[in-house]
Amino acid sequence: MKVFKIAIYSFLISGSLWSCIPSYSAYPREYNHAKADFKKQKVFVVNKDLESEFKILKHSDIYEIVEDSTHAAKITLHPMMKRTPPCGNPMIGSMLTVGLLPSGFPYDIAYSYDLAENSTTKNYQYKLQVYQSLWLFNIFRLGRTFSKQSGKALLGSYIASNK
């Protein structure tokens, strides 16, 4: 009887953990369909060691990132500030229903960088919104990572600010 109880608890815990598959979306929703159909400026990223920020910039496709700094503008990334909900209560529904009940979390991101070109430096600041969804059926949306969707939100914000 004790072995049966342990097996049931193990199954429930592992099922709960496996059922909550994350997927991310850029907000507003029209940013998911934004395309970089403009001439891209060649830039060299000075501090690629900020990996998350660099991946977001790379996925945004706003600039053509080059490895040679001689004939390109220089971008200095700033650490992004991420605000998430203070607790994980929305996730409980997904865990108890083995992923059948979707739940989600909004992420508010303050993203900024400096673009230095011809002895002038311009600071760019964006407020990005990304929504994380936890749901069993997100298994069909596996390519929607945080950095890719944040990149789409950055591209959408960039296009909206340059209209």
Predicted feature descriptions by range:
Residues 1-22:
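Sec-dependent bacterial lipoprotein signal peptides
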Residues 17-37:
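Bacterial Sec signal peptide processing site at the extreme N-terminus
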Residues 30-50:
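Post-signal peptide N-terminal segment of mature Sec-exported envelope proteins
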Residues 60-72:
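Short acidic low-complexity segments
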Residues 76-121, 137-145:
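Surface-exposed short loop/turn segments
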Residues 58-61, 154, 158-163:
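Sec/Tat-exported extracytoplasmic proteins
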Residues 119-157:
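Short secondary-structure boundary motifs at beta->alpha junctions and helix caps
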Residues 48-59:
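Amphipathic alpha-helical segments
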